[in-house]
Design a protein with these regions (language model features):
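Glycosyltransferase catalytic domains, chiefly GT-A lineage
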Residues: 1-170
Length: 170
């Protein structure tokens, strides 16, 4: 793993601080972060080295995503799963930004806590985290998918653009 990346904003800054602390306990690789200006201030005060902070997330940025790309397209996703489409696209853009700087990266959602060294010998250029469904709702995998993007290992520079294209056009 050459780098890590994640997105955060004021509503997830507590999670982001825990993610950063747990990452730095086990890893020294650069961390590419898309965030809002407030999160940038908080993160910079933590004093961690090798952070690449890109404060692009703001109301105008998010509103632009909705108006130009996702308006009404993902209403059901947002209502049922409380998963904002504007943040999903921001996450994909973060992955793309990290891949423009590094040969590979591991994207992590801010609710991930790193408990050990994550260095793995990935056998594919893209690795998605599996979604977990208890036996009683295992069939949900067919409806919602068997993978989520809580973590994404990427070593293919074209993949983020492909994923963004699929997200916007499918």
């Amino acid at each position: 793993i050459q780098s890590f990346c994640f997105t955060t904003s004021i509503n997830r800054i507590s999670e982001a601080k825990i993610l950063l602390k747990s990452l730095r306990e086990h890893h020294s690789q650069p961390i590419f972060i898309h965030c809002d200006w407030f999160s940038q201030l908080v993160i910079e005060r933590l004093g961690y080295k090798d952070l690449i902070i890109n404060p692009v997330i703001n109301e105008k940025y998010l509103k632009n995503i909705v108006e130009k790309h996702t308006k009404n397209k993902y209403d059901i996703l947002e209502q049922i799963h409380h998963c904002r489409s504007d943040y999903i696209l921001a996450k994909l853009r973060c992955l793309k930004g990290a891949m423009m700087m590094f040969e590979n990266t591991l994207f992590l959602d801010t609710d991930v806590i790193v408990l050990d060294d994550l260095q793995e010998n990935f056998t594919t250029k893209v690795c998605l985290s599996p979604a977990h469904f208890p036996n009683s709702i295992r069939h949900f995998g067919f409806e919602y998918g068997f993978y989520n993007a809580g973590y994404v290992f990427c070593a293919n520079r074209g993949f983020p653009s492909f994923w963004i294209d699929r997200f916007l056009k499918d």
